[in-house]
Regions:
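Short amphipathic alpha-helices and their capping/turn segments at secondary-structure boundaries
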Residues: 1-16, 158-161
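Short alpha-helical segments and helix-capping/turn motifs at coil-helix boundaries
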Residues: 1-4, 66-70, 152-158
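Active-site-proximal segment of zinc-dependent metalloprotease catalytic domains
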Residues: 9-15, 20-149, 169
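Alpha-helix capping and helix-loop boundary segments enriched in small/acidic/polar residues
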Residues: 119-126, 155, 159-163
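Post-HExxH zinc-binding segment in Zn-dependent metallohydrolases
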Residues: 158-174
Length: 174
């Protein structure tokens, strides 16, 4: 079983990191066809590391990062999002994750996806960054762009700098 972790259990807003598989029936994904998302296959230690990293990213905000489905289900419909961490990615090629901008408040349980098979596979740092990134989209954030010294747009998606554990990239923009 996935360890039950909560960063701020008293917050009404909730981001649920779902590692144990989920059947998605939302008509907004996969052309309306159901998606049987497999469990992530990540270890308890990897899940805990992902949770800790995502919790740190969202610490300034009044939002509970959780791996506990009961906390997600008890949160108000318009203040929650499920981020499914899954290797079930063949239906959406070329990305490490995907979500709808602003879907956090839609109230219809449209989830976000993080494709752990494409992130390492199952590298906790990469999975956590993607969870925070897709979670950021769901609350309305866009990508951070790059500009030159004259304030001209040079890239619409800032990929960051460096490699390995000391690398840096923005989670989101806006």
């Amino acid at each position: 079983a996935v360890p039950k972790l909560n960063s701020l259990p008293t917050a009404s807003a909730t981001i649920y990191l779902d590692f144990d598989g989920h059947m998605v029936t939302s008509s907004l994904w996969n052309g309306g066809m159901p998606i049987a998302c497999a469990a992530s296959g990540m270890t308890d230690a990897q899940i805990t590391e992902v949770f800790n990293r995502v919790s740190e990213d969202f610490r300034p905000f009044n939002v509970n990062i959780t791996t506990d489905s009961t906390k997600f289900l008890s949160a108000p419909l318009t203040q929650r999002i499920r981020v499914i961490v899954t290797p079930t990615s063949s239906w959406k090629t070329g990305v490490g994750g995907i979500s709808y901008i602003g879907s956090f408040t839609w109230g219809d349980d449209t989830p976000a996806f993080v494709f752990c098979d494409r992130l390492g596979p199952n590298n906790p740092k990469f999975v956590a960054e993607c969870c925070s990134h897709e979670g950021g989209h769901t609350v309305g954030l866009s990508h951070q762009s790059r500009y030159d010294e004259a304030c001209n747009l040079t890239e619409t998606y800032n990929t960051g700098t460096g490699t390995g554990e000391t690398s840096w990239a923005p989670i989101m923009g806006n």
